[in-house]
């Protein structure tokens, strides 16, 4: 879910919703209230979708590495002259 694309899409959907609501009701006040409510519902849906993606990623990572995590995960990064393999095994950024 790429945030700028989502914002542009959300504004387009809200504009279409506002136009349709105005033609159906003929009231600017009612259109504004309903469009604001629609915007809040879209934001709640976006938040829940991002929360689901984070949960799913955490679940998949737990399945891939069922072993015990070290007590101090930054221990190998503190040692001089060593490259942490943990940094190399990171997945690519999902927004690209």
Swiss-Prot record:
GO biological process per UniProt: polysaccharide biosynthetic process
Pathway(s) annotated for this protein in UniProt: Glycan metabolism; exopolysaccharide biosynthesis
Keyword annotations of the record: Cell membrane, Exopolysaccharide synthesis, Membrane, Nodulation, Plasmid, Transmembrane, Transmembrane helix
Glycoprotein listed as a keyword: no
InterPro entries reported for this sequence: SyrA
Main location: membrane
Region feature Disordered, mapped onto this chain: 64-96
Pfam families: SyrA
Membrane-spanning parts: 6-26, 35-55
Recorded topology in the membrane: Multi-pass membrane protein
Name this polypeptide is given: Exopolysaccharide production repressor protein
Gene encoding the protein: exoX
